[in-house]
């Protein structure tokens, strides 16, 4: 997968390209990340990248010319088929279904806004989709872009040591994750659930499913509303609700 980044702070993306799972994916050439800085496309000695908004009001907008030139340069280099995404609070909220959808694309260009945002006409003419990581305000689009890259990269074949990990993690099936345990067997008087040491894989699977359902129902019940539960899941959920009534 090739991801292009339009950002005034490309150095921030070292967190993605040099560390952790995504850093390893970059080293293995499973993930390519390239950056374009609008400052490199300015025409004045001060490298100005902000401008006043029409109608007044607080704050500034990203200047159209250098931003547009950076976007078009990224499109030209990344090539045809690249989806241009603007990270914006007005966008579609990123969830696991959206991550899987975006992971189907081999080329993405992520536009990171700063200041009060960008000219609406650039969104209309240069952007394919707007995506948000939540209902809150950040100082720029870089952190949302890194969140998106990290989530999407997990679905690139070969990035995770065990591909099943991407499909079994929290939200992969629309449910919260089950509890996990490692050594020691007893920690401060708290023991690992015996079923996890039983060696009975079917019982372990059922226990994990039940825990996921219970956590989801208790902590994020709205997630269950959009799921098509299996007969097994419906039966377990009925038992869980009865126990808590």
Swiss-Prot record:
Q: Does the keyword Transferase apply?
A: yes
Q: Write down the EC number.
A: 2.1.1.228
State the CDD domains in the record. Answer: TrmD-like (cd18080)
Keywords on this record?
Cytoplasm, Methyltransferase, S-adenosyl-L-methionine, Transferase, tRNA processing
- Give its localization: Cytoplasm
EC main group: transferase
Write down the InterPro entries for this protein, in alphabetical order: Alpha/beta_knot_MTases, tRNA_m1G_MeTrfase_C_sf, tRNA_m1G_MeTrfase_TrmD, tRNA_m1G_MTases_N, tRNA_MeTrfase_TRMD/TRM10
Record field: catalytic activity: guanosine(37) in tRNA + S-adenosyl-L-methionine = N(1)-methylguanosine(37) in tRNA + S-adenosyl-L-homocysteine + H(+)
Q: Where does S-adenosyl-L-methionine bind?
A: 113, 133-138
Q: Name one GO molecular function term.
A: tRNA (guanine(37)-N1)-methyltransferase activity
What PANTHER family is this protein classified in?
Answer: TRNA (GUANINE-N(1)-)-METHYLTRANSFERASE
Family according to the record: Belongs to the RNA methyltransferase TrmD family.
Subunit composition? Homodimer.
- Name recorded for this polypeptide: tRNA (guanine-N(1)-)-methyltransferase
Q: Which organism is it from?
A: Pasteurella multocida (strain Pm70)
């Amino acid at each position: 997968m090739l991801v292009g980044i339009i950002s005034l702070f490309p150095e921030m993306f070292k967190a993605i390209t040099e560390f952790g799972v995504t850093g390893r994916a970059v080293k293995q050439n499973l993930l390519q990340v390239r950056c374009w800085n609008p400052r490199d496309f300015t025409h004045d000695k001060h490298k100005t990248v902000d401008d006043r908004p029409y109608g007044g009001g607080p704050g500034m907008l990203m200047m159209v010319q250098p931003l547009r030139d950076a976007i078009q340069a990224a499109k030209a280099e990344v090539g045809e088929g690249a989806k241009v995404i603007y990270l914006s609070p007005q966008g579609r909220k990123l969830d696991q279904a959206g991550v899987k959808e975006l992971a189907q694309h081999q080329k993405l260009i992520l536009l990171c806004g700063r200041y009060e945002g960008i000219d609406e006409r650039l969104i209309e003419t240069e952007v394919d989709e707007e995506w948000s990581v939540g209902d809150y305000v950040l100082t720029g689009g870089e952190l949302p872009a890194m969140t998106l890259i990290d989530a999407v990269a997990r679905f690139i074949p070969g990035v995770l040591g065990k591909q099943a990990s991407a499909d079994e993690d929290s939200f992969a099936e629309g449910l919260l994750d089950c509890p996990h345990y490692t050594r020691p067997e007893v920690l401060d008087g708290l023991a690992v659930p015996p079923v996890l040491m039983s060696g009975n894989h079917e019982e372990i699977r059922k226990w994990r499913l039940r825990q996921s359902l219970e956590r989801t129902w208790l902590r994020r019940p709205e997630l269950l509303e959009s799921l098509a539960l299996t007969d097994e899941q419906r039966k377990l959920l009925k038992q869980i609700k009865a126990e808590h009534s």
